[in-house]
Amino acid sequence: MGQKSNPIGLRLKIINTWDSLWYANKDYTTKLHEDFLLRKFIKKAFYHASISKVVIARKVDVIMVNVYSAKPGVIIGKKGADIDKVKQQIVKMINNNIELNIIEVKKPELKAVLIAENIAQQLEKRISFRRAMKRSVQSCLKIGAKGIKVSCAGRLGGAEIARTEWYKEGSVPLHTFRANIDYGFSEAKTIYGIIGVKVWVYLGDTKSSNE
């Protein structure tokens, strides 16, 4: 039986690169756990800022954190008050100097993580899963995606038995390595239980970094 691998991990060093840009020897596990903590903290602190990814690069005396957000104003706050507050909390948490950069995501409708989070938020507001999926798919294709596939799994519509529903438009070639496919996952916490939302977005073919 075929298994679905993560399209981003499958294409690392072909068309994608890592979100953690550093090398470590003895204290690798410590730094890895720090990265997990940083991402979890930033995502939680700015839940409504539509964060697509957090890239962490480590230098000798400073950690550079690039936050890609569709709503940078939510993170920065009035006169940068919110971002300074978060910086202080992170420094206290990991005991290291930090440089926090906010990068705006120009087309959030094409980011799989943001699409998944948007669908999850709609499901939490009791909007029909079919309507939420269809709306997100149409807006994604309108912006310029070549194809999109969405799955919702769980007690959909409050059903007794959990099931998985799919919605697909266009082509999503998961087995083509040069295909630029973005993948995102989110969870909707409803009164019936958790519903998992997965999104694959095909943005067209890309030349590999080795060519």
Swiss-Prot record:
Family matches, as SMART domains: KH (SM00322)
SUPFAM superfamilies, per database record: Prokaryotic type KH domain (KH-domain type II), Ribosomal protein S3 C-terminal domain
Keyword Endoplasmic reticulum carried by entry: no
GO BP annotations listed: translation
GO CC terms, sorted: cytosolic small ribosomal subunit
Domain of life of the organism encoding this protein: Bacteria
Pfam families to which the protein is assigned, alphabetical: KH_2, Ribosomal_S3_C
Record-annotated KH type-2 domain positions: 38-106
Gene3D superfamilies xref list: 3.30.300.20, Ribosomal protein S3, C-terminal domain
Keywords: Ribonucleoprotein, Ribosomal protein, RNA-binding, rRNA-binding
GO molecular function list: mRNA binding; rRNA binding; structural constituent of ribosome
The keyword Nucleus is annotated on this UniProt entry: no
Similarity remark: Belongs to the universal ribosomal protein uS3 family.
Subunit structure: Part of the 30S ribosomal subunit. Forms a tight complex with proteins S10 and S14.
Function, in words: Binds the lower part of the 30S subunit head. Binds mRNA in the 70S ribosome, positioning it for translation.
Official protein name in the record: Small ribosomal subunit protein uS3
Native source species: Ehrlichia chaffeensis (strain ATCC CRL-10679 / Arkansas)
Source organism phylogeny: Bacteria, Pseudomonadati, Pseudomonadota, Alphaproteobacteria, Rickettsiales
